[in-house]
Every structure is written in structure tokens, then in C-alpha cells.
Amino acid sequence: MKRMKKRRLLSLLLAAVMAAGLAGCVPGQIANLLLSAGSRTAQDKLSETAEQKTDQPDETAQPSAPQAAEPAPLPAAATLPGLLGELPVLYDETLTPSVPAFTVESDFSNVINAGDMDYWPQEARDKLLQNGFLVVPGTGDEFFSRYEMNRYGYIPNFITVDSSLHTYHLYFLYLQKQTERNELGPALLELSRTMQQTAQAQLDALAGTEWENAARRTLAFFTVGLCLQDPAAAVPEAVAEPVAAELALIEAADTTAASPVMNLGGDPAAALMEDYTQYIPRSYYAGEESLERYFRAMMWYGRLTFRAADEDASRSALLACLALQTAGGARETWERLYAVTSFFAGASDDACFADYAPVIEQAYGGWPEAAALPQQPDAFAAYTAALAELAPGAVNSMPVFEWEDRDAATAGFRFMGQRFTLDAAVFQQLIYRDVEQAADGSRRMLPEALDLPAALGSDTALAILNEQGEDKYPNYGEQMETVRAQLDSAPAATWTASLYAAWLDTLRPLLQPKGEGWPQYMQTEAWAKRSLASFLGSWAELKHDTALYAKQVYGEMGGGPIDAEDDRGYVEAEPAVFGKLAALCQATAEGLDALGLLSEADAENLGRLYTLNEQLMTIAEKELRGELPTDEEFELIRSYGGQLEHFWTQTVQDEEAGIYTPQQMPAALVADIATDPNGTVRQVGTGVGTIYVLVEVDGSIRLASGTVFDFYQLDVPSSERMTDQDWWALLSGYEQGEDGQYHSTRPDQPAWTDAYTGALY
């Protein structure tokens, strides 16, 4: 099992390079090739080569990239926009940090604005002196508010990567939401309607044959998808009962059960199980009826599998592909939906039309007529035999019993499969069954959020995990080293497969150790842990924004003259993060433009966000070289809050409701990362904290402040998956305790954040 998992992830990583090579990627441009499962045969050949190279006596050898192989031709559905081109490197990769050290007096007497700390408790002052910085959790609703307060209070700003990453999240979410409202939702509804009509014609043609049950299943499948978006849609009498039962389970969204539609006419002992709690609308979908309907329909099309091991389900998959191919305009609509969603979130982890189409054409010598299928048993046998050769997905998102062969139980066709993501693939290899049962009988059923930064090379994250006792699982360390090696040797194209992948890549510099020459506070263990919170906070926003698509393991700028008081601020010295974020803004604009989805206003705002991050990168590089920013650059730092507020206003304004306040639309959010089939879901959440940092500007030490992510991890019952609204209520709520006093319901942050957090009252 371990070798299979290793081979599977390598296959997907190598696919990125192969697809990028076929696309002829040009720097700064969107490629014309979508990373798709359509080349799985070639991927398997490549991964087998990699496996042979790694199956050597030297167990410590890193996986090697195979020699170039001639890729298999891709079907038309795979040649769609989707891969980002090679992103430009905007930051100075040769920069050697040389920030001069400075000493802070124990009474802060050489800090020019020490009076700002007069009300601080001694414990907070001590931690600030020890680490050079302090984070106070739960101090705001939005990231820009603190910066605007600082501007009017003549307090030096500390510009964090957290605040800039959060601003990209706001625009990513806004763009995706607008695309779903205006294009994807209507397109999916029309596609479902077309597919239902075609499936009905197939059932009429196959009545009385051994294909009749499969045709009923296909009709029921698309009827459910249609009804989830249009509750008034007609339900054919032939499938009324299973469709009604399925819709009731989806509406209740409170259990795991056998799917009435997918198991139609099948063996109850081998029933396909579905986790219906996944249909609780979450992220930004909750609260808007049209988006909630789109959420449920896409969840249905993304999660349900026509299993390859089930012959009758494979008939249904063939009929679905045949309907997609032959119904007027259906294939083009599907390709458009797949291309746009893949640009945001990545390619399907499971086999889809792009995989099945060439198999069907090869077995049948072209596209067969539905009515002729019962008379072609040899072709069907060739088709099912070829399906057995398709690689399963890297991530299991289905309830599977432990005695089942996971690959056999999950491999098959998904109409609009949920997407492969590196984080989910990492988590899959670090939970039971890939990680063995501990001596005390416990099983690692859910991953830790820290598994991801640890797998990406963070020794700080790995040390925390071991301190928590994760190494009690016999082969957890071995699995972690395997995943680390895979990711360390992953080709560059892995990180440009989608906006999701590029966002994750933008966060990686936060995990790099900061040694001599970096600002003193960045050299501390406490800062390494704070950077983990920055990484995880932005990653939580990424998971939140792609909750539907990513596959889960199981204003006013201010004015007035500048006062003579020295309020010059500082930019967090992470030029690589700011540079990568600028490149990501550029790739977002170019990709949307290539897809015909970029308005003039959005192009302008993405351009502004690109320029802002490029300027912050330049300032951070100057700081690391020991150079003084210009007066114009200090003014940029000073006015930073107004710029953030502009982007916030652009993304949360509503034509009907008007413009919200930060209290109505806070930055805090919550997202699922994994589900334990025994009834628990692990969620990650964010909040907004204030960071205070002692920095030196032009020879004087000052206390600068800014905003950072608060990070939370918690487990809840699957039937109670939290929405953002639930999370906001939890963060701001109070409940009466047994002592009769009211206490905050805000959960505790992980214990490792104690190293850098404190309270001011």
C-alpha cells in the first residue's frame, strides 16, 4: 500500500511537467493545456520509471525525475486553458540579508514611542523584550482597520504578509463568486437540463434490455443534479422514487448512507456510501439561494462515483459520456465549466470524460448508438478491461470500510470530479491506513494542519507535531520523510497547475529558516512559529475559497498634512512572498483574460494589487540590504490601510445591500480540511490579531504594529460543519458558566502559539 501511494503522488507530480511541456508554456502567459487525467496512461509509465529508480537498496535516496517520455495524445477535453505559464521571478534571489543588529534597553528607554506601552502588563512587556515582537489575538474584524487607526494616530505601521495575502484572498473569492453567479451557475443548469433530456431518450431506447437499469441510474443522476438547481424541474416517473429519496438525504445533510440513485438495482452488500453532511452549504455559498443551489449541484457531480469495479455502474458512466458527446452543445458546455473551475482549483483527481472518452472510442471503434449497445458485448468487455488500467485518484473522499481495497472501492467516473490538491494528497499519506495503528490502539484518522508545512520542509512544524505525540504512530516519521522527499523533488510545473497551486507556492518562503543578517526577531523560534500561523491562516483562506472544488480527505484614503512626529514604518522582510504574490496577481489576470472572464474594473484592481505587492517587495529588499526606503515608500507604508480598504470595499460591496461594515463582514472564516467517516470533521479557522514589533528605522528604534492571522484548529460533528456565520458567532459570543459568570466562546488557539502571543488587558 505504501508503494502504491508513493507511485500515485509521483505520477501526479510528474504529470504537471509533462503537461507543461506539451503546452509550450511561455513566461507570463496562460498555457493552452489543462492538466488533466486524460494522460493517465503516460503518467503511469512515467511513475513506473520513477518507482524503479527509487526501489534501490539505498533507502535514503531521493526520488529522481524520469527521462523524458513520449506522452500519449490527449483528448480534446484536455486541451483547454488551465495551466499557468512559468511565473516570473520578481524578487532578488541572490540577496544576502544584512540588517544591522540593535539593542533594546530593558526599560524600553531607547524606543522613541515607548509611551504606547505604558498600559501594558509586565508579562506582555517581557515577551516583547524577549522575542522582539508580540501578537495579541482577537483584536479586530478586518485587516485594514489597524493600519488606518495607526495612520491617524501617527503610529508606525508594520506591513505584514498576512494582510497582503488576505487581500488576495478577498479578490480571489470575489472573482470566483462573480464567475459562478454570472456564468457557471447558469451553464451548469442548462447542462443538467440537456443531460436529463438525453438520458431520458437513452432509457427509452434501452428499455427491456440489460442496459435498462444503467440507463435509469443515469437519468436519475442527472435529474438529481437538475433538481438541486431547479426544484421545480420535472422528475420522470421512471426515476421518481430514487430521486425523491436522494433529494431528501441531501436536504437533511445529516448522515452517511447508501445512495438511492447510485445503488439503483445494485447489490446492497456492495452499496456506495455517501456522506450527506458534505451538502451543507459552506464558505461564501451559505446565505445566497442561487449559490447554495449551485453548491449542492456541483457537490453532487463532484463526489458521486460510477465505480469501475461495478459493471452496471460502468454502463451508466458510458451512457453519461455518450450523452455528453452527442447532445447538442453539451460537451462544449462541460469543457467550459471544467476549464474555468480547473483554472481556479486544479484538475480532477478522479477519472472524468477526458479519461473515458478515448477508452470508449477505442473499444467501440468510435461513438456507438445507445440503442446498439446491448448488441456489442465484446466492445463492452474491452471497455471494462481498459477501465481497470486507469489509475485511481490520489485522494479518497468516500466513506470506505477498512477491510475494502481502497483503490478498487473508489476508482471510477465522476461527471465533474473534485480536484487534486497537494495538501489533500499529503494528508492522505499521513493518516490511517497509510500511517499504522499505534501501540495503544489509536488510529490517526484525521491529519493535523501542521502536517502540511512539515511536509513542505518546516522543521519547526515537525518538532511541534512530535511534541504533540504524532510520532507514536509506528511509521508516521517514515511517511513524513517520504512525502518530504516527493515534494522537495517536485517539478516547478507542480506549483503552476492552477491558482490554488500557485497560492500554496506563494506561502512556501514563510517556512524557510531565517538566520544571520535577517531582522533579529525573525531569527527567533517564536517568529518561526508565528510564520506557521501566517502560512496556515492564508492556507485556511485558500481551503475556504475552494471548499466546493478541492477534494477533501476523507474606501476613503484619509487626508491632512503629515505630522512632524516620526511615524515611519516597516515592511515584513519577506520579499519572496510579496514577489510571488505579485506574480500570482499577474497570472490571475492573464488567465481570466484568456478565459474571457476579466472585466476592465477587475483588470485595473488586479493591476493595482500587483503594483502594491511589487512595491512592498522592493521595500523589503531595501530593508534586508540595510538601505533606507524613500520618502515616497514610507508614505506607501503610512497609507497602506487605505489601500487595503479600497480592495475590501471593492470585494464586499453588494448592489442590493449596499456596502457592509467590517463588523458585518469580518475577515474571520472557517473551512473543512478532512473528515473522519466515524462522524467527525476537522476544521481550521482564522481571526485577526495585532502584532507589535520592535524595528529600527534610520537609526531609531520604534514599536510598529500591524495585523496578522489568528489560527485555530477544531473538531466538530460532521452534521454540524460550521459555516462562516457560525464561526463569527463563536468568536464573538459569550455563554454563562457554572459560576454564573459569562465567558467568551472563542476557542483557544493551538498551544504552540503561546510562544509569541499575549494579552494587553
Q: Where does each model-flagged region fall?
A:
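Bacterial N-terminal signal peptides that target proteins for export
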Residues: K2-L12
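ATP/adenylate-binding site constellation spanning eukaryotic-like Ser/Thr protein kinases
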Residues: A15
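C-terminal motif of bacterial Sec signal peptides marking the signal peptidase cleavage site
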Residues: G21-G24
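Bacterial signal peptide processing site
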Residues: V26-G28
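N-terminal, intrinsically disordered, polar/charged segments of Gram-positive cell-envelope systems
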Residues: I30-T79
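Long, non-catalytic protein-protein interaction scaffolds
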Residues: Q62-Y761
